[in-house]
Design a protein with these regions (language model features):
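Active-site mouth loops of central-metabolism enzymes
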Residues: 1-8, 61-75, 129-137
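Short, acidic/polar
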Residues: 8-15, 73-82, 137-144
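Conserved, mostly hydrophobic/aromatic
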Residues: 16, 83, 130, 154
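Active-site-adjacent beta->alpha loops and helix N-cap segments on the catalytic face
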Residues: 31-49, 98-113, 136-141, 161-174
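Conserved small/polar residues in nucleotide/adenosyl-binding loops
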Residues: 189-192
Length: 192
């Protein structure tokens, strides 16, 4: 089982590494917004910590919905390129339409930007669809779309507030995916 821990700074990445995390997801403003795109410098610094499977970088310009204006889409595509250039082992991205489906043209552009920058940097990167997945109306059709777009994994709580409540759905998604894409259970934990 791969353990990925969301962090928002170098200290968090170091602690995650020391405690045995396989990889980290780097986000800014994690607790206030659910995570935003971190700075180029923060990505570089965290990429040097030595986490075995590296740093996955959340690309998200603001909190709130995952329906983005054209200007926000442009920013995210540029941020994907910058994150890979800064040393990210992958990016965590996504967008949806007002009617609860994946924004396919935008999501394709994000994945292509990541792969193109990876080629330019002469390394492989992973592309993950973030928890906007839990808000999609037809998650099985969404999995087919993400597989077609070449995504590595999808983050989901199974549509529940916490993973244990979503275990049944996680099992269904995993069976449907049948190894074509990784279903990664995720949750938000805050210490008491």
């Amino acid at each position: 089982m791969t353990v990925e821990i969301a962090v928002q700074d170098v200290e968090g990445a170091r602690i995650a590494h020391e405690e045995g995390a396989d990889r980290v997801e780097l986000c800014a403003a994690l607790m206030g917004t659910g995570g935003l795109t971190p700075s180029f410098g923060m990505i570089q610094a965290c990429s040097h910590v030595g986490v075995p499977q590296g740093v996955q970088v959340l690309i998200r310009p603001r909190g709130g919905s995952f329906v983005f204006a054209d200007e926000e889409k442009y920013v995210q595509i540029a941020d994907v390129r910058s994150a890979i250039l800064a040393g990210a082992s992958g990016v965590v991205v996504g967008g949806m339409t007002e009617d609860g489906r994946i924004d396919v043209p935008f999501t394709r552009a994000l994945a292509e930007a990541a792969r193109n920058e990876a080629v330019r940097c002469n390394r492989k990167v992973q592309v993950t669809y973030h928890r906007a997945f839990d808000m999609l109306d037809d998650q099985f059709a969404a999995l087919d779309t993400l597989i077609e777009l070449g995504f590595t994994r999808v983050l989901t709580s199974g549509g529940a507030a916490c993973v244990p409540d979503g275990l049944g759905r996680l099992r269904e998604l995993s069976e449907y995916a049948a190894g074509r894409i990784q279903i990664q259970a995720c949750l938000l934990y805050t210490s008491p």
